[in-house]
Amino acid sequence: MTTTPISLTPGVLAEAVVDLGAIAHNVRLLRERAGSAQVMAVVKADGYGHGATAVARTALAAGAVELGVASVDEALTLRADGITAPVLAWLHAPGMDFGPALAADVQIAISSIRQLDEALDAARRTGTTATVTVKIDTGLNRNGVAPALYPEMVTRLRQAVAEDAIRLRGLMTHMVHADAPEKPINDIQSQRFKQMLDHARDQGVRFEVAHLSNSSATMARPDLTLDLVRPGIAVYGLSPVPRLGDMGLVPAMTVKCAVALVKSVSAGEGVSYGHTWIAPHDTNVALLPIGYADGVFRSLGGRLEVLINGKRRPGVGRVCMDQFLVDLGPGPLDVAEGDEAILFGPGTRGEPTAQDWADLVGTIHYEVVTSPRGRITRVYREAETVER
């Protein structure tokens, strides 16, 4: 897949351009890797910073059949925006009123007896059957029913189904190693999951679907695939296993801004707070009107590069709340105010990538793409990618 250049919208200070063609490509690829399993596209955290509703529509059109989010509020936002496909929400505060979720036909994932009781309370109050998935803990030791409590959960589920209080939709778990599909714990988790699934069946409790595969398992461990796969980061074109390359995925987000000012700096003069960078010779700098309040990590000061007019330009000095500077070098200027500066993108034009940023600051690309905010305007491009 190749990408076509994306121009900065006139009059916009900075923008995160989301290529919906890339999203569609990635979902189609995930469908291929999933084999006979269906795809639940995860659009939590506002679609990993890409916009949940736009991503959801694109993913569904490309072949995903369900959507996954963390909170009920995220699911209700999708419903308010006209999304009618099945949506599963799996992270809930104590005392959650599931009534609005049931009224909106949002599926609830429960991780404890208490959450089951809260879902049953909402079902009885509203006269609506709750569609429930049970999330079990197979080793992550985070959200999910603990193995020791699972037999009691199965008993309670059997009673609730007999009362027609719930529709028992699914059994799910989450992988420990999101970026290491070869780790033995993945197989241990799969074995535990299947044992717990068998226990429920032995007790007369049957789930419509079972699913544990995340992005990395979908792409690299087809033997773990069950009825559904739940890819998240791969939907957005970021490799779930960076050491294995792009895996055929296309990053969907490009962050860019306009050059706000170009000025000369004499040798020996410093720039930005604290003068952490002193010009070694007469040079020129460009001011970019975007800073750590917008998602450009302060720790990138003096470390990041941006692409302007086809050349990588090094950042100099500290990243400020609203702005930072890049060195254009001495001599004749080849950058003017208003020129486009690309902070990160797919990398196809030589610009840095989200993975480059992650490597610089010691984090993961998930954090990079979920960080753009503040004065960055999200813009969508419907067909910026072309199949090869």
Swiss-Prot record:
Entry annotated with the keyword Isomerase: yes
E.C. number: 5.1.1.1
A GO cellular-component term linked to this record: cytosol
Database matches in InterPro entries: Ala_racemase, Ala_racemase/Decarboxylase_C, Ala_racemase_C, Ala_racemase_N, Ala_racemase_pyridoxalP-BS, PLP-binding_barrel
Reported cofactor(s): pyridoxal 5'-phosphate
GO annotation (BP), single: D-alanine biosynthetic process
CDD domains: PLPDE_III_AR
In-chain residues carrying the UniProt-annotated modification N6-(pyridoxal phosphate)lysine: K44
Class of enzymatic activity (EC top level): isomerase
Catalysis performed (reactions): L-alanine = D-alanine
Annotated residues for binding of substrate: R142, M321
Keywords: Isomerase, Pyridoxal phosphate
PROSITE patterns with a match to the protein in the record: ALANINE_RACEMASE
Annotated metabolic or biological route of this protein: Amino-acid biosynthesis; D-alanine biosynthesis; D-alanine from L-alanine: step 1/1
Family classification: Belongs to the alanine racemase family.
Stated role: Catalyzes the interconversion of L-alanine and D-alanine. May also act on other amino acids.
Name of the protein in question: Alanine racemase
Lineage of the species this protein comes from: Bacteria, Bacillati, Actinomycetota, Actinomycetes, Mycobacteriales
